């Protein structure tokens, strides 16, 4: 009877240990974020833990309780796991992998996509800037390393400007005061000044910015733009007309 009781207690202890796991291996098999380092993880096989590092510049992302992978991700996702392996950068890249600003505050719509220490340049959609904090293309005024005015080539007029050309429709949003200005070189684009900083918007094909409605509208609803469009069409038609040969004397 005593032997049976001891065997039962041993079984309970063994299976209880397997169910609870260890700090290194919460389950016998899987990959788990480790310690305070954002680019390392523990790989467990049958309960045996092995510490591993992601390639330089990639961070470990815990997808489920037992699965994870090294992936491109901004450092801001590390939170309390703030430590990283020493950087192994090149002339082109701060680390072997990752997305990085190009270092020019006036051309912040282009960023470096680094793989194995080699950078390829990637462009954000027009008017947006690369945000290293989120690994996304964002409004230039929200990107610390970007000079929104120099990048977009537009300075928001002062709110109390007396210049008629600076007159703008005004809205108020949770972000602050919004002022709308047509692009000085084309009717198809316009700027929204948010707290004094510009953001570029683009109307769709066959549309122009209507400063009265603060929306993109048909050209014939925007008289000043419609006149420019008709003149442009006239000049284009003239260029396409065949040249008439002049008779020789």
UniProtKB/Swiss-Prot annotation:
Molecular-function annotations in GO: chitin binding; structural constituent of chitin-based larval cuticle; structural constituent of pupal chitin-based cuticle
Subcellular location: Secreted, Extracellular space, Extracellular matrix
Keyword Secreted: yes
Gene Ontology CC annotations of this record: chitin-based extracellular matrix; extracellular region
Cysteines joined through disulfide linkages: 54-70, 124-137, 203-216
Coiled coil segments of this chain: none
Cited SMART domains: ChtBD2 (SM00494)
A UniProt-annotated Pfam family: CBM_14
Predominant location category: secreted
Biological processes annotated in GO: chitin-based cuticle development
Record carries keyword Glycoprotein: yes
Domain Chitin-binding type-2, residue spans: 22-80, 90-148, 170-227
Protein name: Protein obstructor-E
Species this protein is from: Drosophila melanogaster (Fruit fly)
């Amino acid at each position: 009877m005593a032997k049976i009781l001891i065997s039962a207690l041993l079984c309970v202890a063994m299976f209880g240990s397997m169910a609870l796991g260890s700090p290194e291996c919460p389950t016998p098999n899987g990959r788990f974020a480790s310690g305070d380092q954002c680019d390392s993880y523990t790989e467990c096989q049958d309960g045996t833990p092995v510490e591993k590092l992601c390639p330089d510049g990639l961070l470990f992302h815990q997808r489920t309780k037992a699965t994870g992978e090294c992936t491109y991700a901004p450092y801001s996702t590390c939170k309390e796991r703030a430590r990283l392996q020493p950087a192994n950068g090149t002339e082109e890249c701060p680390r072997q992998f990752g997305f990085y600003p190009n270092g020019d505050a006036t051309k912040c719509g282009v960023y470096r996509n680094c793989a194995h220490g080699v950078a390829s340049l990637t462009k954000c959609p027009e008017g947006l800037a690369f945000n290293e904090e989120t690994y996304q293309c964002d409004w230039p005024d929200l990107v610390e390393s970007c000079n929104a005015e120099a990048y977009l080539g537009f300075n928001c007029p002062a709110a109390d400007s007396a210049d008629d050309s600076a007159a703008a429709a005004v809205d108020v949003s949770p972000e602050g005061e919004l002022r709308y200005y047509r692009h000085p070189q084309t009717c198809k684009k316009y700027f929204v000044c948010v707290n004094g900083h510009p953001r570029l918007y683009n109307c769709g094909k066959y549309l122009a910015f209507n400063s009265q409605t603060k929306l993109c509208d048909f050209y014939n609803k925007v008289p000043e733009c419609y006149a420019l469009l008709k003149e442009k069409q006239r000049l284009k038609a003239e260029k396409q007309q065949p040249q008439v040969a002049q008779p020789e004397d």
